[in-house]
Structure formats: C-alpha cells, structure tokens
C-alpha cells in the first residue's frame, strides 16, 4: 500500500517535497518544475519514519531560507 503522508511546496519556486509511505518503507521525493513544463524528480527511500522526517524537515528549512540551490537540495537525497 502506498500513500502520501505530506507534501510541501516552496512559495518562491514551485518546487515541492513529498513524504510518502511505500509498503514498509518511507520515501522523500523532491520535485523541480522545468521550463518546458515537465518535472525533475529525485527521491530516496528510508527504513524508518524518523529518518525520512528528518530529511523532509531539512527540505522545509531550505525552502523557508530560500538560500540553497537545486543541487544542494538534491544532495540531501544522496
């Protein structure tokens, strides 16, 4: 069973981050709108909700500060 737990959109750029449950794992997905209307997705799976929430929270902090590049944000999921 898969479902979205939370999704947050950056008010400045339209970028989004979602926290999803996929079976017994949790996934953080970073979504970047491209100029041609398509989207670039980067995601990472986590074994625990605590680990996934930690990364999800970091994205929200990055969105709030507005100081970090797309590359910096993608690096959170490496």
Question: Predicted regions span which residues?
Answer:
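Short N-terminal "domain-start" leader segments
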Residues: 1-31, 69-70
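Tryptophan-centered short beta-strand motifs
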Residues: 3, 38-40
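Generic detector of low-complexity/intrinsically disordered segments
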Residues: 7, 21-24, 36, 51, ...
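Secondary-structure transition/turn motif
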Residues: 10-11, 30-34, 45, 75
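Well-ordered beta-strand positions in beta-sheet-rich domains
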Residues: 16, 43-45
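A short, charged, amphipathic alpha-helix used as a generic interaction element across diverse proteins
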Residues: 34-38, 45-67
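Short glycine-rich, low-complexity/disordered patches
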Residues: 62-78
């Amino acid at each position: 069973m898969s479902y979205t737990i939370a999704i947050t959109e950056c008010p400045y750029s339209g970028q989004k981050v979602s926290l999803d449950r996929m079976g017994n794992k949790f996934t953080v997905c970073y979504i970047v709108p491209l100029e041609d209307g398509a989207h670039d997705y980067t995601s990472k799976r986590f074994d625990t909700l605590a680990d996934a929430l930690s990364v999800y929270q970091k994205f929200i902090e990055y969105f709030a500060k507005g100081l970090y590049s797309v590359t910096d944000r993608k690096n959170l999921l490496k």
